[in-house]
Amino acid sequence: MDFSRRDFIKLAGSGLIVASCAPSLAFTAHPDQPRALAFSNLHTGEELESCYFDGRVYVANELSRIDNICRDFRRNEVHKMDKYLFDQISLIQSQLGVDAEVQIISGYRSPATNAALRSKSNGVAKKSYHMLGQAIDFRLDGVNLKRVRDAAIELQAGGVGYYPRSNFVHIDTGPVRRW
């Protein structure tokens, strides 16, 4: 059965697809298409171009390289990131018709870093998905932030936070919700 992205979004929006399955089903229309992203970490200055899915399987070495650029830079701790975050970003780019650099504000956060940030801001969740490697704060270079947020919401693939004053969007692979 072929699904277009639009068909998938309709199904996801109507609740016929369980939210936790949505990221893995999101690419059923084009399962054999390679997926590549270009990243820059705004805190470390590192850049990375990665083809993390070769059209058949996720490429473990490339996912490890992405985990490294998404590390907790404050403590230099690397944690395995949820690969479906990258699928979400790839879908967002596809929806928007862009191939923009993914500028990372925050990927993995150690519990110690999360606690330190939480002590300074009430906007940091106590049980943040960042501590599980299931969240990323980012923007797409040169792309209107509201468009990125709207595309992420349309996916219905997890949480979406919009932070226009700080110039980033948060996405995670938890339950579908937005703020």
Which residues make up each language-model segment?
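Cysteine-centered nucleophilic/redox motifs
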Residues: 88-93, 110-113, 138
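Short, solvent-exposed loop/turn and secondary-structure capping segments
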Residues: 50-51, 116-118, 150
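Extracytoplasmic/secreted envelope proteins and their assembly/folding machinery
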Residues: 86-90, 114, 145, 149
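Catalytic cores and adjacent binding grooves of peptidoglycan-active enzymes
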Residues: 2, 35-40, 120-179
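C-terminal segment of N-terminal export signals and the immediately downstream linker at the start
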Residues: 20-51
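Acidic helix-start/capping segments at beta-turn-to-alpha-helix junctions
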Residues: 101-115
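Active-site acidic/histidine clusters and adjacent loop/turn architecture
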Residues: 55-105
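N-terminal secretory signal peptides and thylakoid transit peptides that target proteins
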Residues: 1-19
